[in-house]
């Protein structure tokens, strides 16, 4: 491990020294150990990283992407590595203001020839704008002698500028104009939104150090009642570069489509070339514009369209809500309805909102139901008298006439309303992962309220059945067939008897109101005693009593089977004689438990039927000395030798001859 550290330190020695000096000038201190660890990780997962280092911000962004990809594969990236990478990336951002691009003259000759052959253009001006891949992106690893280190601390820690009361002048004096409602020091502007590609500068004007997002055409227009945006707002700090005041782009629906929003569309295309624009979606908002320079004098106010971006907070709320609660939860549906009815969402807006909020499978479902709804709506438009001139391309935002934002922004109100209804219906049919099941498998639980069961049934039918009439019939059928027995008994008198024009499901819910509560249970008990039910029908007991033969009760609860009947049956059973001989003695026709014979039919003794006493414990042999009985006539004989207590029995058994009798004890 120590050899690896020393090898990495020697390999990137000059670059490490420069990075440490760069961070120190900016007021940041990073230990050499952490930097060596960072470059070890870079060397492991980014083998393309040059030994002499690089100041190109795109290279460090690429390092971050590859480290993220390595982390997704299961590799452990220490937290200090991420912190050091972010600090170095932020420290290198000020160096991207003066970019050096490779000119077309420095490219190989085959590059220009290939470009001319592909495009068919011979002018040098057009060739410069259409150079191929040999003209690389800006190379930033140039000389570091002219670095302005005073900007670095303001970029990494902008709050220090407030404490010191100073900041770098990032915008020339010619750019100073009254700013919007939220003046910020130029040092606090986020530098992550700077363009990374080379832009051809105008030599007649001084170059601007930073370009801000959003573009000038999309920035906020301050209200006219105050010079600084709202009453009581303090003036801008002296010596700080304000935001330039942008003009507002307005689209006239009555004008031709070719001239609508040309500046806006050009800004969007340029922003896409300079950076990622996926999070900045555009929606169309109607506003009432007073007569001004753009219109004739004395003209009344007219409604015009204005494009505004989706806020990041709104996109984040929808994304987190879909992930946590589901795409069709009440929270998401309420939020989506408010967005849809509060704005003029074009097909491009709906597609962008679905892509940024739904998963891949959910977006595929949304797109499928969207296309299906468009086809049905087009058939309705053609069948209407007079015919509505709204085709499928307009509702889907496709085709040569409706594929761009400019073209969709001037859509008529009726088309916007149809797109809104179709997309909301398609969103409602999205199945969350793991929740798809057939509608006939939805059954009411024994204790589930009937309205909850009907709500689950309608929700599943809404997502799986497109036709409204078929969905209504199936819901009414399943609302009775899949209900529990209590609700079925309450609904049965209403089935097929609901008057025309009255909602069947509503009548079912009214009939099942209160089922399962304490009052309903008390009513059931009272009606069971009277033989009635909720529907007014007598519920009879179908089984027959085996004792009396009547219907309505069992034998164990038969009122005829009283105590006297039980005694009589017991006496009859006792007096009944067996059909064969006694199995014990074999001599008479009586029961075995009533047999008193002492001998069987063959004369063999039988064990008595009387109860015996408790059995005696077994006697122990050999534990005490054996005292043999000596008859009286053998008292003169010589006594036997003394035998040990435990061996006397075994020696007597081994003796072949009869031993001499022992003298009897005196009487």
Swiss-Prot record:
InterPro entries linked: B_retro_matrix, B_retro_matrix_sf, Gag_p24_C, Primate_lentivir_Gag_pol-like, Retrov_capsid_C, Retrov_capsid_N, Retrovr_matrix, Znf_CCHC
GO biological process, one term: viral translational frameshifting
Leader peptide range in chain numbering: none
Top-rank taxon, per record: Eukaryota
PTM per Swiss-Prot/TrEMBL: Myristoylation is essential for retroviral assembly. Alteration of the glycine residue leads to a block in the budding of particles and an accumulation of Gag inside the cell. Specific enzymatic cleavages may yield mature proteins.
Subcellular location field: Cell membrane
Lipidation positions, renumbered (N-myristoyl glycine): 2
Zn finger (CCHC-type) start-end: 543-560, 580-597
PROSITE patterns, sorted: ZF_CCHC
Keywords per UniProt: Cell membrane, ERV, Lipoprotein, Membrane, Metal-binding, Myristate, Repeat, Transposable element, Zinc, Zinc-finger
Job of this protein: The products of the Gag polyproteins of infectious retroviruses perform highly complex orchestrated tasks during the assembly, budding, maturation, and infection stages of the viral replication cycle. During viral assembly, the proteins form membrane associations and self-associations that ultimately result in budding of an immature virion from the infected cell. Gag precursors also function during viral assembly to selectively bind and package two plus strands of genomic RNA. Endogenous Gag proteins may have kept, lost or modified their original function during evolution.
Family label: Belongs to the beta type-B retroviral Gag protein family. HERV class-II K(HML-2) gag subfamily.
Additional facts recorded: Intergenic, closest flanking genes being RPL24 and FLJ23047.
Protein name: Endogenous retrovirus group K member 5 Gag polyprotein
Organism: Homo sapiens
